């Protein structure tokens, strides 16, 4: 589902720049796209306490993520109609909705997998080869965490801080994106390993305006096993150490 959403985001973003000769391929592409659905969480809403409260998890998943899914599906259906009708003005207007809500769905689907209760390994440091790669590029795991926290705290307004793999440069990177932009909007060669939501809805009910405290505590429930699995999958043909 995540790959499907990313594809449709880029179809929408670049729709007006495509040559007319390619227009004939866009409608079948849109028709093949499936609507998004809210994924179930792999843990209970209170399983991440005290790092993240049950109240926040319920609101974040049931309200915020669900809204992105609903609005994305609505925009996707409208885009299909606009393309079928040749309504280029509406196609242009729908691009920002597709990007924002589709991106919100993509990011949150990753975010839930990036978290795990302590009793299920949340916060447990990663194993090799990811551990060695982190040491090589950031000096230590603590060095990576400090950089992530600093970059996340410095995001102006709303956005995300990412720990990712740059397959082109063959190295690990820390990046930030604004609003609900997925990491892939900075380049298809970037693979998200960990994404941390720094929108206020992710922490304000519990931490108020103390974003730095939220960033400090969230590492106790980070699912490093998931990050390590994604890293290994995408580095089988790379040497990044």
UniProtKB/Swiss-Prot annotation:
It comes from the Eukaryota. It is found in: Mitochondrion matrix. It is an enzyme of class 1 (oxidoreductase). Binds 1 Mn(2+) ion per subunit. InterPro entries: Fe/Mn_Superoxide_Dismutase (IPR050265), Mn/Fe_SOD (IPR001189), Mn/Fe_SOD_BS (IPR019833), Mn/Fe_SOD_C (IPR019832), Mn/Fe_SOD_N (IPR019831), Mn/Fe_SOD_N_sf (IPR036324), SOD_C_sf (IPR036314). GO terms for cellular component: mitochondrial matrix. Homotetramer. This is Superoxide dismutase [Mn] 2, mitochondrial. The lineage of its organism: Eukaryota, Viridiplantae, Streptophyta, Embryophyta, Tracheophyta.
